[in-house]
């Protein structure tokens, strides 16, 4: 399944979604604000995951738009650390979306819960602080001059 979702993300990227998102972010972002770039990348990963249902599909789009050109090439981030933290940010979106049916809706059906969105409602209080912590850890630890 992850291979198919990654392929879906690649198709979105090849269709120009990554370039369009990159143009929008370069127009909005201050050019020398590392923190803003980290926020856009992590929040974008979470948002695209909410829409597409899985971080594997969101990863190629956000990496082509923000991750590679800004965080790696411009700010010289540690590639493995930045992209691992980006996937974690995407997984925060997975916790909050019914599009990730295999994680959120199927268990509710199998457990015969009264509220099919119960797992999502229970996971949001974890997902939001985890996303904030992911942004802070990436900002503080994944770039030259950071804590690591």
What residue ranges belong to the model's regions?
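Hydrophobic alpha-helical transmembrane segments of multipass membrane transporters and ion channels
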Residues: 1-5, 40, 125-133
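Small-residue-rich segments of transmembrane alpha-helices in multi-pass membrane proteins
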Residues: 1-3, 65-75
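Core transmembrane alpha-helical segments of multi-pass membrane transporters/permeases
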Residues: 1-17
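Transmembrane alpha-helix interface/packing and boundary motifs in multi-pass membrane proteins
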Residues: 5, 9, 43-58, 88-95
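Membrane-interface interhelical connector segments
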Residues: 16-35, 74
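Hydrophobic alpha-helical transmembrane segments of multi-pass integral membrane proteins
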Residues: 28-70
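Alpha-helical transmembrane segments of multi-pass membrane proteins
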Residues: 36-46, 75-96
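Juxtamembrane and boundary regions of transmembrane helices in multi-pass small-molecule transporters
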Residues: 84, 90-148
């Amino acid at each position: 399944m992850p291979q198919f979702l990654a392929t879906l993300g690649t198709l979105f990227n090849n269709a120009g979604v990554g370039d369009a998102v990159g143009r929008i972010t370069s127009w909005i972002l201050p050019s020398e604000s590392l923190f803003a770039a980290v926020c856009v990348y992590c929040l974008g990963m979470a948002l695209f995951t909410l829409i597409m249902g899985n971080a594997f599909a969101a990863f190629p789009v956000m990496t082509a738009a923000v991750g590679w050109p800004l965080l790696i090439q411009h700010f010289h981030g540690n590639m493995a650390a930045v992209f691992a933290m980006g996937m974690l940010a995407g997984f925060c979106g997975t916790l909050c979306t019914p599009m990730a049916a295999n994680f959120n809706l199927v268990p509710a059906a199998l457990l015969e819960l009264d509220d099919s969105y119960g797992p999502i409602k229970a996971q949001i209080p974890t997902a939001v602080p985890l996303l904030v912590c992911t942004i802070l850890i990436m900002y503080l630890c994944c770039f030259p001059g950071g804590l690591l």
